[in-house]
Design a protein with these regions (language model features):
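Structured-RNA-binding interfaces characteristic of tRNA pseudouridine synthases
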Residues: 1-253
Length: 253
């Protein structure tokens, strides 16, 4: 039964971003949002509202646990059937894990309380990691990099790590650390929000710390300068993964 009232549904998905121009729909460029919209239009309604994502990942960036919502007139939508059909319709580098009815006050972007990213640095050349991890052969001091990472928690203005001008550059970074897994160095960072290119710039600057090109005092000065030109290089997008998005517990996702 359809009514004039719209009902909200949440999608949980994963994607490899190497062949896409990011999440947000664009003219004449393949995007994650664009591909899912095609599927929703095909199986539901040509006039179905735009799907809204938890964030706007850049070109080449991947996502392990991404959320988006859309609205539809029928609250009794067969979500299992839609899940099956969408996964058949979508390219292999996008997977829908679940589709659920959610309360009307939920918003995939604005209801999120934190987002977590991981950046993968491969210390060994591996053809199976092409467009999946950043290969970096030089030896890095992981202990120094973790000391520097911890300094990020005491600073909220992150404008040193983004070229874009923001009215609000304040980010509440809740955790930032490196760990090693076999031939991989992984940087994990969680915050309530992120600026454009912020994680990739932080990783590049921390690599400079690991190479001992800059010391811990230099790193602190870079943060406090609020000037992107003082920070290090931006690592490639293909090593970056949105690994999780957290929402208030009242939303059962």
């Amino acid at each position: 039964m359809q009514t004039s009232q719209l009902h909200k549904f949440i999608i949980r998905l994963s994607f490899l971003g190497a062949n896409f121009s990011g999440w947000q729909i664009q003219n004449n460029a393949p995007t994650i949002q664009g591909e899912i919209m095609k599927g929703l239009h095909y199986f539901l309604d040509r006039k179905s509202p735009l799907i809204v994502g938890a964030g706007r990942t850049d070109a080449g960036v991947h996502a392990i646990n991404f959320f988006a919502h859309f609205e539809f007139y029928n609250q009794y939508l067969d979500t299992n059937n839609l899940l099956y059909n969408l996964n058949r319709f979508l390219p292999d580098n996008i997977v829908i894990h679940s589709i659920k009815l959610v309360s009307s006050d939920f918003h995939a972007r604005f209801s999120a309380i934190s987002r977590k990213y991981e950046y993968l640095v491969s210390t060994k050349k591996d053809p199976f990691l092409i467009n999946r991890a950043f290969y970096f052969y030089k030896e890095l001091d992981l202990e120094l990099m973790n000391l520097a990472s911890n300094m990020l928690l005491g600073h909220k203005n992150c404008s040193s790590f983004s070229k874009s001008n923001y009215d609000n550059s304040i980010c509440n970074i809740q955790s930032a650390y490196w760990f090693k897994s076999k031939n991989m160095l992984i940087f994990s960072i969680e915050s309530n929000r992120f600026l454009y290119n912020m994680v990739r710039c932080i990783v590049g600057t921390l690599i400079d710390v690991g190479l001992k090109k800059i010391n811990l005092e230099d790193f602190t000065n870079i943060i406090e300068s609020n000037n992107r030109s003082n920070a290090g290089f931006s690592v490639p997008a293909y090593g970056l993964y949105l690994s999780d998005v957290k929402y208030p517990k009242k939303y059962i996702l």
